[in-house]
Amino acid sequence: MPSVKAPYIYAEENWADDMELAYANVHAMMKSTDENAGSGWFFGQAVLHAQKEPITKWIINDTANHYQWYPFVNAGHFELLKQIKLKQAFPKQASGFSAEFINKFPTYYDTLSNYYKQGIEIVWQRASENAFYRGVPFIWCSNNLTVAFAQQCYWYRTQTGDDSYEALEQANIDWLFGCNPWGTSMVYGLPEWGDTPVDPHSAFTNIKRYPIDGGLVDGPVYNSIYKNLIGIKLYNEDEYATFQSNLAVYHDAEQPGGVS
């Protein structure tokens, strides 16, 4: 049970991806002569945690509670792929975990990259049904999910050389800069000559009107979510009213969650 009474909290549930990234980075910092590097213990623990959460759960469930599965993309897979590819911190005479993973290099490399591919394919099945290639759910922080998914596509493409999903990757980037139903950039001040957010959830702009160029706003949400938000109210006319739909809405106005 949460220890606060606020209606919106950051209730992260997953942890295996964090531990995977931690173990992978500890291994990367070790010299190949280090005893623990030689046994491959930290590397092996990273792989074992990768197996606990092969696909980030919001991708599978097509939804999430507020920050339920943060940080929306598994960076540990990318670190492991780099280390296997470079055989980073592995001794010449490997033993234990490192020997197993080096000897089975193609198998483990393909397995880890396939974790990314499986997640991308799930989103693609949804995205392929609309002109914007939109397969990311319209939940809170949908723009953060969009960035995370584009990052996953990029890491998969650059590590494997498979550009099958490059158009999907680019569509998610384009979405953030105006190729969306509202025709507006989701990044404050970028491009300078375009339609960009002017009233983000930020004390800097709300109180002192300071610019926060480069700030990413939360983005559109399902209409059903918007109608049930607590403490949210539009103080100005909805400039995007013509483009709102029963599916999703976007407002250039203060919303909980704010600029990322």
Listing of model-derived features with the role each one plays in the protein:
Residues 2-6, 53-60, 124-136:
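Acidic/His metal-coordination segments adjacent to aromatic residues that form catalytic metal sites
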